[in-house]
A protein has these predicted regions:
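Gly/Ser/Thr-rich phosphate-binding loop
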Residues: 4-68, 81
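Hydrophobic/anchoring residues in structured secondary elements
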Residues: 23-26, 178, 225-226
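Active-site glycine-centered loops adjacent to acidic/histidine catalytic or metal-binding residues
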Residues: 28, 51, 74, 89, ...
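Beta-strand->loop->alpha-helix junctions that form or flank phosphate-binding loops
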Residues: 47-54, 74-75, 179-182, 225
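Short Gly/Pro-enriched turn/cap motifs at secondary-structure boundaries
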Residues: 71-77, 91, 121-125
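AMP-binding/adenylate-forming core of the ANL superfamily
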Residues: 83, 94-108, 126, 132-133
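AMP-binding/adenylate-forming catalytic core of the ANL superfamily
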Residues: 88, 104, 109-110, 117-120, ...
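Acidic/polar alpha-helix N-cap and adjacent early helical turns
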Residues: 245-263
């Protein structure tokens, strides 16, 4: 995803240089629909693959299937068995969201020297990936989000990817990452780190209106943090831990400033 953003935003980006390319395969994180659509304008399909450090290449979509289901990671490759499980480790129905679990010879037998971590990462020989997913009636699988990144605000579950997808549709947004931050009343609230294409004074009002037209009120970010560069981790993915710390720090500073003002 980081590479696709960078490619599109290069000043010397020329679509003619990519005329011979019909599709590219990506993994690591799922591109936003806006990125898929941007590449499709140039006749390039982004095909999603899926794998983990614990299980290299588990699934990959096909060029033909990607035309109709661009956000799918396709079906399991040969000798890989995949299920989508609920919290009680029961398989969910088509279209329902649960945790993706896989069983195969290429799955790690466990974590070296960490028996407890190994034990909680497996269920009946299936490795629990930590990724929320759903399966359609054709057996194609879609990654929804990381389970641990689910935001619970006032008892409501919010998928960061859903908020990011809606936010990315606004013409002001060049890039966005959504996280939960500590909130005294709701436990967590929603914040977005954003890179703006253009600096305008009323960007918060514009984004808030845009989001409320697309999502339920509890899914709308309560805070926006403009940044010039998105923090990335060692694998060049957005570093949500750092971004979350930035949000909490911003809230604490604002609370401290307000307390001093009222003193």
């Amino acid at each position: 995803q980081t590479m696709y953003y960078s490619t599109l935003n290069q000043k010397n980006f020329n679509p003619d240089d990519f005329r011979a390319i019909k599709f590219v395969i990506q993994g690591g994180s799922q591109p936003l629909p806006s990125i898929q659509q941007a590449f499709k304008k140039y006749g390039i399909n982004i095909i999603n693959g899926y794998g983990l450090t614990e299980a290299p290449l588990v699934m990959v979509n096909t060029p033909e299937n990607a035309r109709h289901k661009p956000m799918s990671i396709g079906k399991s490759v040969m000798f890989v068995d995949a299920k989508v499980l609920d919290e009680d480790k029961n398989e969910v129905g088509d279209g329902e969201i649960g945790e993706l679990a896989i069983r195969s010879k290429n799955v790690t037998p466990g974590y070296w020297g960490q028996p407890e971590e190994t034990k909680k990462s497996f269920h009946n020989q299936y490795f629990l990936t930590g990724d929320l997913a759903k399966k359609d009636e054709d057996g194609d699988i879609y990654i929804i989000d990381r389970k641990k990144e689910l935001i619970i605000t006032g008892g409501e579950n919010v998928l960061p990817s859903e908020v990011e997808n809606a936010l990315a549709e606004h013409p002001l947004i060049d890039r966005c990452v959504v996280v939960g931050y500590e909130h005294p009343k709701y436990g967590e609230s929603i914040a977005a780190a954003i890179i703006l294409r253009e600096k305008v004074p009323d960007y918060v009002e514009q984004l808030d209106k845009h989001m409320r037209e697309r999502l339920a009120g509890y899914k709308v970010p309560r805070m926006y943090l403009p940044v010039t560069h998105m923090p990335l981790n060692s694998t060049q993915k957005p570093d949500k831990l750092v971004i979350r710390e930035m949000m909490n720090s911003k809230v604490n500073k604002e609370s401290s400033s307000e307390a001093n003002h009222n003193a």
